[in-house]
UniProtKB/Swiss-Prot annotation:
Its main location: cytoplasm. One of its GO terms (molecular function) is manganese ion binding. Presumably involved in the processing and regular turnover of intracellular proteins. Catalyzes the removal of unsubstituted N-terminal amino acids from various peptides. GO terms for biological process: proteolysis. This is Probable cytosol aminopeptidase. PANTHER family: CYTOSOL AMINOPEPTIDASE, LEUCINE AMINOPEPTIDASE-RELATED. It comes from Klebsiella pneumoniae (strain 342). The active site is at 282, 356. Mn(2+) 1 binds at residues 275, 352, 354.
Amino acid sequence: MEFSVKSGSPEKQRSACIVVGVFEPRRLSPIAEQLDKISDGYISALLRRGELEGKPGQTLLLHHVPNILSERILLIGCGKERELDERQYKQVIQKTINTLNDTGSMEAVCFLTELHVKGRNNYWKVRQAVETAKETLYSFDQLKTNKSEPRRPLRKMVFNVPTRRELTSGERAIQHGLAIAAGIKAAKDLGNMPPNICNAAYLASQARQLADTYSKNVITRVIGEQQMRELGMNSYLAVGNGSQNESLMSVIEYKGNPSEDARPIVLVGKGLTFDSGGISIKPAEGMDEMKYDMCGAAAVYGVMRMVAELQLPLNVIGVLAGCENMPGGRAYRPGDVLTTMSGQTVEVLNTDAEGRLVLCDVLTYVERFEPEAVIDVATLTGACVIALGHHITGLMSNHNPLAHELIGASELAGDRAWRLPLADEFQDQLESNFADMANIGGRPGGAITAGCFLSRFTRKYNWAHLDIAGTAWRSGKAKGATGRPVALLSQFLLNRAGFNGEE
């Protein structure tokens, strides 16, 4: 699907369809008022007859409106004008895309980007429209033999901006939006792949392909079990012991900063391609969704794709910690004591608290890069789902400025995170009689004690932890990976690169 921006009058658009908003109760948006005036009150007459109230989600498709060059006008209900916020704006765009696709409009000029969204500029509105459009049209049908496609799918979308001065920022918004949307799609595709296909080797192959595509400044190295043993990554290795699939850590290095002294930002993704729970096996119900336990790695992969596509002037390293947690004769057990790469020892009380055992060794490994910051992304705890539900990602950090940056980026991207405390009081719950620490700290504050566990391996750099257990996928009828938090991390890196959308 193609996207572009232009600045023009609505009545002069020779398009299959133009899209304008209507507010509650039956109030025309400024652009719709222009069309109404030129059509001698045709649109307002329809509204007076009660054809459209302007409530969110309502639509009315008009054909051959007098004095208008476009074949059709799509009126979209936007709710009350003062209540149009970021979330409502994206829902309006989503409804627009679905309606255009369902009605066979292959191209359209969209004036919704001229609606007022409090505190958001045209760059934001165009970029969010692109990302939302791509999200709306996403489907995962690679493994289906019968693929259903619309008869006349939407192929071209033009977003109108108020003045020619804003064309440059609009074009930049489309460029950024497409790169982020492609990263989200890549993350969703990886997450939705079944575990018999998407194992650690598959993750490694995707990481290598990324380096092949962007060979100018992307290098991928894959570290296998033999090298992990030499490095002392015994905790990571223990988790994969019960699986026939080899544990593989894929390290993607992107160099975009011309300065020799520039330190990298490191992203670490938990990549449990299937988590049965191991010996502490999970209940059968819903276990199929444990293929999504690699969504942290999928998100890091998606972000690295975005960074390489936009050639951001940063150094960024993405680590995909691929592994599979299975029961078996070689599987690690409750009661085992593991010596981590850091030298600290961990008593295993539950083999289903495995993500932190993989991440702790990776967080030690990345010290060698002398990072500016490290952010790990993991479907880590069911406790985070209880705390924050399925809408907001949990954030913990040992560095206040980094935490504030991430929260700000999450708000701007519409991919929200909420900070949880890493208070010393919670550390006591990890005490063990037989090792330096236990791998679980009981039910109270489970998301926080998991963060506390990881914090013991991140003392040499600024670090943040994103627990995406509640936000990485949806269950039920809309089952599938969400691609979160690709948008959050993309915004964070765009901010770091100086692209704050204020041009």
